């Protein structure tokens, strides 16, 4: 994989699926990563779907969907990732960025604010706060209050 010989790496991981099936989640993740790095995003999504690395797989698939401009699919996956408390803040800010990328300014602002309000002590809230100030000129305290400038 390091030499960027993606097809050879994929073939090796596919062989490992039969040789060591107990690690199928790792092998499918590696196959998906090769597809993603080589720009074959639809194939990457299909391989990520075979992996068992949740909730990380939601973020990986959503990233591919965003690169394909399939924003609704990405949003569904980020909302699924929000169900896991350990990744909820990260998923929330990704929802905001996805709306922003798709041209949904109002929803983007709403989700950046939600990230600040729901997860005030996280780095994602700090990032959302800074983004609201710099891009949208909205001042939001990490406690959730806001003031338009």
Predicted features, each with a name:
Residues 25-26, 56, 90, 124-127:
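Start-of-helix register in tetratricopeptide repeats
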Residues 30, 60, 94, 128-131:
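Canonical tetratricopeptide repeat
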């Amino acid at each position: 994989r390091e030499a960027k010989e993606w097809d050879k790496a994929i073939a090796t991981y596919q062989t490992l699926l039969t040789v060591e099936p107990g690690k199928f989640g790792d092998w499918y993740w590696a196959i998906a990563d090769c597809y993603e790095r080589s720009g074959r995003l639809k194939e990457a999504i299909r391989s990520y779907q075979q992996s068992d690395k949740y909730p990380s797989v939601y973020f990986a698939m959503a990233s591919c969907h965003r690169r394909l401009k399939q924003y609704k699919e990405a949003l569904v996956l980020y909302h699924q990732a929000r169900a896991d408390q350990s990744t909820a803040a990260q998923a929330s800010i990704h929802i905001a960025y996805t709306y922003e990328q798709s041209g949904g300014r109002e929803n983007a602002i709403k989700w950046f604010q939600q990230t600040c309000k729901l997860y005030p002590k996280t780095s994602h809230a700090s990032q959302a706060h800074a983004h609201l100030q710099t891009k949208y000129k909205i001042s939001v305290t990490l406690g959730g209050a806001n003031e338009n400038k």
